[in-house]
Design a protein with these regions (language model features):
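Catalytic acidic motif of RecA-like/P-loop NTPases
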Residues: 43, 209-210
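Conserved P-loop NTPase-based nucleic-acid remodeling module centered on helicase motor cores
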Residues: 32-142
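Short N-terminal helix/helix-N-cap motif within the alpha/beta-hydrolase-1
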Residues: 47, 213-216
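Accessory N-terminal region flanking or inserted into the helicase ATPase core
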Residues: 2-5, 14, 102-207, 213-214
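Hydrophobic helix-cap positions at the C-terminus of alpha-helices
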Residues: 21, 25, 29, 99, ...
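Short, well-ordered loop/turn elements at secondary-structure boundaries
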Residues: 1, 31-33, 60, 198-200
Length: 216
């Protein structure tokens, strides 16, 4: 397995080069092993159109356009793990609200802010960032312990304390029953060795300005 980088400034033609590379391989051998074109969610439709509308290609079954989430769903359907109920942003907000109510006696700061406009949404974004940067509840607990030992700012101490409680409680509530959008990528990483679809696939990654540690 080799890794190649195509570099250049914005507008230099990197996407055109990649698409032409994929088209050439499809023309050469239409029944070839899978080609995966991995792009940001907002690029999937246009990328699919560009491939499907290529003159001379009789279908694009061998080449598929995916976002990270769509690829995760495809692999989980093959290997198992897609049976858990997907938790939308609304569902996540409801679960966070429930946790804040149930844990209000343990919380030092968040219980006073739970009713404020936008707080639950901000809380969700904080939890999403923790997952994207591969920080587990256990690591969060370790970080909190270190900060509590040296940090003088009581407000920050209280925030870290409460965030640790909410994050740990959320993961316990999700375990085995629900899956949120960020967890799809974690499961994808675990299932890659079991996927026959990915075994001989060629993967092209395009359109990302940056990648989170979870995506990497």
């Amino acid at each position: 397995m080799s890794l190649q980088f195509l570099t250049g400034r914005s507008g230099a033609g990197k996407t055109t080069w990649l698409l032409n590379e994929i088209r050439g391989k499809l023309r050469e051998k239409p029944d070839r092993s899978p080609i995966i074109y991995l792009v940001p969610e907002q690029m999937t439709f246009m990328s699919e159109y560009k491939l499907a509308s290529t003159p001379g290609l009789n279908g694009t079954i061998a080449a598929q356009v995916y976002s990270f989430t769509r690829l995760a769903w495809r692999v989980l359907q093959e290997t198992g793990g897609s049976s858990r109920t997907h938790l939308s942003s609304v569902g996540m907000n409801m679960m966070i609200t429930k946790i804040l109510e149930e844990k209000k006696e343990e919380l030092k700061l968040f219980h006073r802010s739970a009713g404020k406009t936008g707080f639950i949404g901000n809380m969700e974004q904080m939890l999403i960032e923790l997952k994207r940067y591969c920080i587990t509840p256990e690591e969060m607990k370790s970080i909190t312990s270190e900060k509590l030992a040296v940090e003088a700012d009581q407000s920050l101490k209280d925030k870290l304390h409460d965030l640790e409680i909410v994050y740990g409680s959320l993961e316990q509530a999700l375990a085995g029953k629900y899956i949120d959008s960020e967890d799809y990528l974690t499961l994808l990483a675990q299932k890659i060795p079991q996927s026959a679809y990915l075994q001989d696939a060629e993967v092209y990654i395009d359109g990302f300005y940056s990648l989170t540690p979870q995506e990497l």
